[in-house]
Every structure is written in C-alpha cells, then in structure tokens.
C-alpha cells in the first residue's frame, strides 16, 4: 500500500480554499519565508506555504528551489562547524537582509536553526511556523467572535470544532 504524504502547509491551504480555515491576514507583519531544503528542492512545494501566510513581503536572495540550507540538513545540526562558517548564521544574515520583522518556516529544524542564527547575527526577527501564523489569526478571530457573542449574563457562547469537522 502506498501512502500519500502531505506537508502541513498543503493541508492548511486546501482547508483555506474550502473555507474551513480563515484566509491569511498579516495583521501588520512583514513576512519572508525560509524554504526548507526537502520541501522546496525535493518536494517542489513552494506555493502552499506562501499561500497559507498570504504571500511574502520580500523574498530572500536565495529562495524557492534555489534556497540556502538553514544548517540542519543532513544532520548538520549536531555537528561542530568552524565559528566563522556557521551555515545557520550565513542563512540568518540573508533572512535579516529582507528587512522583514517575521520569518515563516515550514520545518521544526529550520525553526531552531534560524532562531539561533538570527540571535547570533543580532537580528530582531520573530520565527514562526506557517501553522503558528495561522493559529494567531484563528485565536484573534475567536476572541473577536467571543466579544461579539457575550449574552446578557456576561457568558460567551463558545464556538468549537474538531479536526474531523475540518477534513
């Protein structure tokens, strides 16, 4: 039996298209996206993560199929590198050059490596997975709904859904 595997950004994008998840809103953020090596170069999944976050405000110099590794690929994360040649710091400097305040990622290893690299180069950027950016929107929307639906006793009607309602 063959199993079809999807990246979470593909599932989120599908659910957004079907109206089961909200469309992306940047809420004042300027966003760039770091393409994970396997996602972009091997999986050719370039559009879904960008769609989920409402597009990018500025691409890094090397992006898409030509993206540069975060430094975790091939188990690099656990190897010692020369202090002046750390891959994650090189990549972080490229990301910081975009001038964006947020970098979206689609891989937990990339998240760790990019955060560490940005700290090392002194860049003040937030690193969030595409799903975390969407989650922020859902929470903000639900708080807005909560405020609008308070009844006279001050209690709120809570909207609930489960994953089975979405797929």
What are these regions (language model features)?
Residues 1-167:
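Iron-sulfur cluster-binding electron-transfer modules in prokaryotic oxidoreductases
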């Amino acid at each position: 039996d063959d199993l079809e595997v999807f990246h979470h950004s593909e599932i989120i994008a599908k659910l957004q298209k079907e109206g089961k998840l909200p469309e992306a809103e940047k809420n004042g953020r300027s966003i760039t996206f770091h393409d994970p090596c396997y996602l972009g170069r091997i999986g050719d999944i370039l559009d879904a993560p960008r769609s989920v976050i409402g597009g990018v405000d500025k691409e890094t110099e090397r992006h898409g199929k030509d993206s540069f590794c975060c430094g975790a690929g091939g188990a690099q994360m656990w190897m010692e590198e020369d202090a002046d040649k750390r891959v994650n710091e090189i990549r972080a400097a490229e990301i910081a050059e975009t001038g964006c305040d947020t970098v979206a990622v689609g891989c937990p290893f990339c998240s760790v490596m990019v955060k560490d690299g940005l700290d090392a180069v002194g860049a003040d950027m937030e690193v969030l997975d595409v799903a975390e950016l969407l989650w922020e929107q859902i929470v903000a929307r639900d708080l807005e709904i909560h405020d609008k639906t308070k009844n006279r006793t001050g209690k709120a009607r809570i909207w609930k859904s489960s994953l089975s309602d979405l797929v």
